[in-house]
């Protein structure tokens, strides 16, 4: 088994209340390696049918994101992990500062930041003919502004180790039907490259992971049949695939990798 050298490192992960999600899976992967884990999440209320949450699909996904992080916390407890759970809103500057204040008071530093939290429009208004100011503002507030402010505070509170991993999508460059979401992720990829150059002098690396269609609880059987043929490797990406990539980028072994966008898409995006 690879030793990533993450024991006792402090990893802060946003968007971590969905127990089937990338954030939660990444948190457990860090805990497995002996890292101290900070989960930050915000409840997102969207209508769902509670009778359909027992299987994969949008109802399960919406229900998970509307809840707290108790399921994830229970798993971390069983692992014997050292962890902290914070409910907050990264689109709010004061809230971001409070996140870091709380984490620094408990652990004294933050070594790794995983900007996983994101939002999108699920009402069909993220197209050029229907786009609204609210969709634009809400999407960029979390996906860009929130990630930027989390990164700023990380840099300003930096210690002697620094890894930043942003989460994008394999469709960031072209995402017809969700143009604002795609644009926000393309912006995050551009910021990854620029910030990497700015902070290289501190020995901090900044990279981005761009997942393809990932089973975080939202892909039902019908959609799986549609999307799987688009993936050359013939199967959906799993959250663990993303988490293991993040672990490597957070490790000492990846110390000379920075400013890169790593597509984990089974060949769907090259």
Q: Where in this protein do the model-derived segments appear?
A:
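Substrate-binding pocket helix/loop in short-chain dehydrogenase/reductase
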Residues: 124-128, 132-137, 227
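The beta1-alpha1 cofactor-binding region of Rossmann-like NAD(H)/NADP(H)-dependent oxidoreductases
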Residues: 63-67, 87-99, 133, 240-241
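A conserved structural motif in NAD(P)-dependent oxidoreductases
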Residues: 231-242, 253
């Amino acid at each position: 088994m690879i030793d990533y050298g993450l024991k006792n490192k402090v990893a802060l992960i946003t968007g971590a209340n969905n127990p089937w999600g990338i954030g939660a899976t990444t948190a457990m992967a860090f805990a497995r390696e002996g890292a101290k884990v900070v989960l930050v999440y915000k409840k997102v209320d969207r209508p769902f049918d509670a009778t359909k949450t027992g299987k994969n699909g949008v109802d399960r996904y919406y229900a998970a994101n509307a809840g707290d992080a108790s399921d994830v916390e229970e798993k971390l407890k069983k692992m014997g992990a050292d962890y902290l759970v914070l409910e907050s809103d990264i689109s709010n500057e004061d809230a971001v500062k409070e996140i870091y204040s709380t984490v620094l008071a408990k652990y004294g530093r933050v070594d790794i930041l995983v900007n996983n939290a994101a939002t999108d429009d699920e009402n069909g208004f993220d197209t050029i003919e229907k786009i609204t100011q609210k969709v634009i503002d809400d999407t960029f507030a979390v996906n860009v502004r929130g990630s930027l402010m989390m990164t700023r505070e990380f840099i300003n509170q930096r210690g002697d180790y620094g890894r930043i991993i942003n989460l994008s999508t394999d469709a960031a460059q072209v995402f017809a039907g969700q143009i604002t979401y795609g644009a926000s992720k393309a912006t995050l990829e551009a910021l990854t490259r620029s910030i990497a150059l700015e902070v290289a002098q501190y020995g901090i690396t900044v990279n981005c992971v761009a997942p393809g269609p990932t089973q975080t609880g939202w892909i039902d059987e019908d959609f799986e049949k549609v999307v799987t043929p688009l993936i050359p490797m013939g199967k959906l990406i799993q959250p663990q695939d993303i988490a293991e990539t993040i672990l490597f980028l957070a490790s000492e072994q990846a110390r000379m990798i920075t400013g890169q966008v790593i597509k984990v898409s089974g060949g769907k995006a090259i």
